[in-house]
Structure formats: structure tokens, C-alpha cells
Amino acid sequence: MASYKFKTQNSFPLLLSISFFFLLLLNKVNSTGSLSFSFPKFAPNQPYLIFQRDALVTSTGVLQLTNVVNGVPPRRSIGRALYAAPFQIWDNTTGNVASFVTSFSFIIQAPNPATTADGLAFFLAPVDTQPGDLGGMLGIFKDGSYNKSNQIVAVEFDTFSNIHFDPKGRHMGINVNSIVSVKTVPWNWTNGEVANVFISYEASTKSLNASLVYPSLETSFIIHAIVDVKDVLPEWVRFGFSATTGIDTGYVQTNDVLSWSFESNLPGGNSVASVKNAGLSTYAA
């Protein structure tokens, strides 16, 4: 089975072991093209991020993707935050493709847990990417149709089931050029709980994997799909987060990212600037 959920006391240590092993593999690759950064928390006016629409960093160091007004999330909010430097996902000269790992923690909280909308996603898109539509489009896509020219890959954490393009119930999904996911797995969202996410892409197998863990609940959700990023994405991309609240009254939630790290290697690629420790130091990879 390509995607599944499991609940076990040993699941979180297992996922950490897998993550550590994959990071070791990345570090052993003989590569001149790499990108690495770590934001244990965020800083207001963060210079290494591009903010679009409603996204901002709060005074407490939280990346708040959608609006909160007087403590309440409003409807029809959309926000995105992208890593500022373009990222070379594949090399047109050599044909090599980058492997990468990214991890982040987020909280989604709703005033009414029965009426959540719409969701949060991690995505890769063309360098000049601009916000998509509200609501169910998650700020990434313009409409529900498949379009190869979108050149987008996303992992979504969807809290509202749109009858036209979603499975029934809250879910995680992998999206390729469409809001209609190529793979989904049911997701038991928990109101106000910290979720830890680990996403990896292995270039040699074209394997995109994502796991979400609620440490306090010892519950995990895992999804996997084969995605040829060289066929889907342009050579250079930007990547980051997008989130939306619902269109209808009452269908709202917060979409807050607490921390974020990323590491990649592209054999024979170009060197790019990287940051560590929330921008306190920079280096050329």
C-alpha cells in the first residue's frame, strides 16, 4: 500500500531514525550544488523569506500564514511564505536531479473544530510563482483542472473536503499540477496540537514521501508517490508554504508554522547561498 496510517508508541522514533539516515545520505553525496537552512523560530521582517498576501511573522517568532483578527481567524484569508533564493531542482546540462529533505512543525487551530477550512501545503513552483485562488485551491492553484503548465508539486494538509475534487474527510495529499491529488491518505487532524512533518524526495527512485506526527498523541500519517520532478518542475524553482481559510462564514482556522529546516544536494549543480540558525549566519554551500 502506497500510503497508510499507523499508531504505535515506537512510530515517532522510527521516523526520526529514517530522517537521520536520509540526512546522512545527503551529506555523503559528492555535490557542488546544495542548499541548507534551519529556522528553529522565525524573525519579523525575515530577510530570507518572501511573504505573499496575508503571511507574516509574529512578535513571538511564529510564521502566521493566514490572518488572525482580535484572536479570531477570518474567512477568505490567503497567505504564502517562500524561501527567497531560487533553488536548482535539476541540472539541464548534466540531467542530474536534486534529492532533498525538509521538516517543519505547524499548528492548525479552529474556533469550531467541526467547521475547519481550508488547509496548509508545502509546495515547489516556478521562481515567479504568485498566489492562486482562495479556499479549496489552498492559494496554490487557479482552478480544479490539471494543467501541465502549472509546474507545481505540493504536499497538502487539507481540513475541508471539497466535493468536486477531494476525497471524503480531512486528508493529506500529494499534488502534481492540480489541486486533485495523485495520492491521498485520511488524516485525523487534532485541534491545536503541534504536528511535526518530514518530507523527502529521493532523485534516484523519484520517490516523494511525507509523514506527519503528533508527538503528544503518538499518532502518525504517511503518504508516498512517484513524482518525476524533472518532468514536472522547471530547472529552477521556489518553495515554501501556502494556506487558506474558508470562503463560507465560520469555516476558518489558524495556519501557523513554528519551525522549518531544509537540506538538498544536486550532483554537479551550482552553489547557492544558504542560512543556518534562523539567519544568524550564512555560508556558500
Curated annotation (Swiss-Prot):
Q: Which residues bind Mn(2+)?
A: E156, D158, D166, H171
Q: In which tissues is it expressed?
A: Expressed in seed.
Q: How is it modified after translation?
A: N-glycosylated; three of the four potential glycosylation sites are occupied.
Name the source's superkingdom. Answer: Eukaryota
Checking CDD domains in the record gives: lectin_legume_LecRK_Arcelin_ConA
Detail which positions bind Ca(2+): D158, N162, D166
Write down the SUPFAM superfamilies for this protein, in alphabetical order: Concanavalin A-like lectins/glucanases
Give the residues annotated as coiled coil: none
GO MF annotation, one: metal ion binding
Q: Which residues are glycosylated?
A: N92, N147, N188, N209
Q: Which keywords annotate this record?
A: Calcium, Glycoprotein, Lectin, Manganese, Metal-binding, Signal
**Which InterPro entries has this protein been placed in?**
ConA-like_dom_sf, L-lectin, Lectin_LegA_CS, Lectin_legB_Mn/Ca_BS, Legume_lectin_dom, Leguminous_Lectin
Annotated signal sequence is 1-31
Keyword Nucleotide-binding part of the UniProt annotation = no
Its function, per the record, reads: Seed lectin.
Q: Subunit comment for this entry?
A: Homotetramer.
Instruction: Output this protein's name.
Output: Seed agglutinin 1
Taxonomic path: Eukaryota, Viridiplantae, Streptophyta, Embryophyta, Tracheophyta
